[in-house]
Amino acid sequence: MSEKNILKEILKPYWYEKLSSTILNNKDYDYFFNDKDRFFPNLENVFNAVNNIDLEKKTKVVVFGQDPYPRKESATGYAFWDGKIKSWNDRLSPSFKNLFKSILISYGVAEKKDNIAKLRKTISDKAIFSPDDFFEKSIKNNIIWLNASFSFEGKAQSLLNKHLKFWKPVVKEIIKVLLESSDDVIFVFWGKKSLKFQKFIIDTGYKNYHFVENGHPMLENFHDKNSFNDINEILEKINKNKIDWLNI
């Protein structure tokens, strides 16, 4: 298999048609695609978040993260989905913990001050599904967990910037497709890197978008706002069904 054909192996045909020219014409293409072991996630998982978008559904929620998890076993190709975590009793990263804590707060069954032990008890008492089940069900309901950068190589700022620069035009093409194929798109920005796409969305000329902003879930001030309530408020305003986050 030639290096140039690797995209056909890891992108579904529709997305290959939409994204391949942007990727193949990037001067850093070889750097990103000729060494399968250079970065996380595994190459076959890099486009998971894109390949599983159901374009037939006219209302979409796009949750922007920043970078993949810096561990091969954790990086899934989706923002915030940590593949290493199979049970709520596993060690949770701050981002993962705060994301689900915020969902519980939105239902009034948790408080900002609750520690991890109390959160686990609440999850057990409510018989809430596993972490993997949550993400799988949300994806089927067309919640799109999209990182601003699709790959991670190292924590050096120069590397973070290199990856972000490579993926930025790709993410822009994805955004255009989502706006073209949808009645409404709710873009959820968690973290400063993802906010850089706001101006691009506005400048596309489309009017079918809505914004939800918050800090990154790794920080405790993530709970100063509740993005999950904000998403449902927008859905209610545009006469769409609200999302039952605990029973997606």
Residue ranges and their predicted role:
Residues 198-248:
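C-terminal accessory segment of soluble enzyme catalytic cores
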Residues 181-204:
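Extended, basic/helix-rich recognition subdomains
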Residues 1-11:
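Low-complexity, highly charged intrinsically disordered N-terminal segments
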Residues 9-182, 195-196, 210, 216-222, ...:
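A polyanion-binding, active-site-adjacent surface
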Residues 138, 167, 190, 245-248:
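Tryptophan-centric aromatic hotspots in well-structured domains and transmembrane helices
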